[in-house]
């Protein structure tokens, strides 16, 4: 029997999903993206060679894996073609392996202009977006005025749709944000030119997924960003514009939720966040700087330094619940090597002194809580590259056991380094 496994981040993104997706693609016939856009950044290291992917699923490096981009993904044609060229220059035959849903909304130049103008207008209250037009493209989708990949198959109809929406968006750019409009003819010509390369990769992704299911083949669904950035369930408004939680798998691909067999939550052994928003365990001391330096905490997409903090079991329990997580993959354990003490947030103290064990829904209230910590002894020995749990330092094993108890979920996979073979697998998602 084939299995359908979802991989998603359980924190604020940057949890190390790319490596784990690449590791698990040994078992699959297909990998599918179901939300987000080129604001995602997946860094893969294979035999010491670094590859950063933004739109294309991480399985693209495997010759026997179909890579699908579902309807929930917003597609920037220029970014996708640039990524394809980068991979083709490395000898990867992308166009034979990549399939795009015609229902993908397109990100076009006016979306990026709106994104940048909006962040500029917000000033110190900015969300901290990547400035790549993701949010405005999702807005157009929900407002039912967006253009989709399938529209490019009929150039005359596309030209009419584009003209109508650009009249609206250019009015907003000029008269509200007081910035230069985007040229319609240039946008039309460039997009139709790119369509010549994109349309041959267009396919009914939903139907393909169900064909894999009927043939009892394994499929992996690759999430982007993290659960605490979900548009509905994250730290709103400091969130992304898509559903990053398990529910987005079904709506972003057309693959019903009852067909999903296992949800793997990718979780760092500490916590990081890029951009603005609540982060109760954030560290501003030498330990925070240590984690940032040792963990190389800079965004794969933006290059921005990530905020670093201790492991937050309260936020993670919430993520486990809203995703029906089957098991956790703990990443970057080796970054904690050398610390005398490691802390885990086990509760929050509110502004009025009450202790709570769930994150506040209100973002302002979330930003005011203070973490309640449990301290555990650290370890001096290296965990880097360890492949068996019994070979980990005793204190590292105790840390993992403590986390399991706090989050009320099994830790099935432990990553001890960036390469795919630097992994401890306690329970394999495709055989669980």
Swiss-Prot record:
Assembly = Homodimer.
Q: What does the entry list as the binding residues for GTP?
A: 13-19, 41-43, 306, 332-334, 415-417
Enzyme Commission number(s) of this protein: 6.3.4.4
| Sequence positions that bind Mg(2+) | 14, 41
Entry's Gene Ontology molecular function annotations: adenylosuccinate synthase activity; GTP binding; magnesium ion binding
UniProt subcellular location: Cytoplasm
Which cysteine pairs make disulfide bonds?
A: none
What's the source species for this entry? Hahella chejuensis (strain KCTC 2396)
Q: What is the lineage of its organism?
A: Bacteria, Pseudomonadati, Pseudomonadota, Gammaproteobacteria, Oceanospirillales
What is the protein name given in its UniProt record? Adenylosuccinate synthetase
What keyword terms does UniProt attach to this protein?
Answer: Cytoplasm, GTP-binding, Ligase, Magnesium, Metal-binding, Nucleotide-binding, Purine biosynthesis
Extract the InterPro entries matched here.
Adenylosuccin_syn_GTP-bd (IPR018220), Adenylosuccin_syn_Lys_AS (IPR033128), Adenylosuccinate_synth_dom1 (IPR042109), Adenylosuccinate_synth_dom2 (IPR042110), Adenylosuccinate_synth_dom3 (IPR042111), Adenylosuccinate_synthetase (IPR001114), P-loop_NTPase (IPR027417)
Entry function:
Plays an important role in the de novo pathway of purine nucleotide biosynthesis. Catalyzes the first committed step in the biosynthesis of AMP from IMP.
> Known catalysed reaction(s)?
IMP + L-aspartate + GTP = N(6)-(1,2-dicarboxyethyl)-AMP + GDP + phosphate + 2 H(+)
């Amino acid at each position: 029997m084939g299995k359908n496994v979802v991989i998603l981040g359980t924190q604020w993104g940057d949890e190390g999903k790319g490596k784990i997706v690449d590791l698990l693609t040994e078992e699959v016939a297909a990998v599918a993206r179901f939300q987000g856009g080129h604001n995602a950044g997946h860094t893969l290291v294979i035999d010491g060679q670094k590859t950063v992917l933004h739109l294309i699923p991480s399985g693209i490096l495997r010759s026997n894996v179909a890579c699908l981009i579902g309807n929930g993904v917003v597609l920037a044609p220029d970014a996708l073609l640039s990524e394809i060229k980068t991979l083709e220059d490395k000898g990867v035959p992308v166009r034979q392996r990549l399939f795009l849903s015609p229902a993908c909304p397109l990100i076009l130049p006016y979306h990026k202009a709106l994104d940048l103008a909006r962040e500029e207008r917000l000033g110190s209250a900015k969300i901290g977006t990547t400035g790549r037009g993701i949010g405005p493209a999702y807005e157009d989708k929900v407002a039912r005025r967006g253009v989709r990949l399938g529209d490019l198959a009929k150039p005359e109809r596309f030209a009419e749709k584009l003209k109508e929406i650009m009249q609206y968006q250019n009015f907003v750019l000029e008269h509200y944000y007081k910035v230069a409009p985007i040229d319609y003819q240039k946008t039309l010509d460039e997009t139709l030119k790119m369509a010549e390369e994109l349309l041959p990769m267009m396919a009914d992704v939903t139907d393909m997924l169900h064909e894999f299911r009927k043939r009892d083949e394994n499929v992996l669904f690759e999430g982007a960003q993290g659960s605490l950035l979900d548009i509905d369930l994250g730290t709103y408004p400091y969130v992304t514009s898509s559903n990053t939680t398990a529910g987005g798998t079904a709506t972003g691909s057309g693959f019903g939720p009852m067909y999903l067999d296992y949800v793997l939550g990718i979780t760092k052994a500490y916590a990081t966040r890029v951009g603005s928003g609540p982060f109760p365990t954030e560290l501003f001391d030498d330990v925070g700087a240590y984690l940032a330096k040792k963990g190389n905490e800079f965004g794969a997409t933006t290059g921005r330094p990530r905020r670093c903090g201790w492991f937050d079991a309260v936020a993670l329990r919430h993520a486990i619940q809203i995703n029906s997580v089957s098991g956790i993959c703990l990443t970057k354990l080796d970054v904690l090597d050398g610390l005398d003490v490691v802390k885990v947030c086990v509760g929050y103290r509110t502004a009025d002194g009450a202790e709570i064990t769930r994150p506040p829904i209100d973002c302002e209230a979330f930003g005011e809580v203070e973490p309640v910590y449990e301290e555990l002894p650290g370890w001096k020995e290296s965990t880097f590259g360890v492949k068996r749990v019994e070979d980990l330092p005793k204190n590292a094993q105790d840390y993992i056991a403590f986390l399991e108890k706090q989050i009320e979920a099994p830790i099935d996979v432990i990553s001890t380094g960036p390469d795919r073979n630097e992994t401890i697998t306690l329970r394999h998602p495709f055989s669980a």
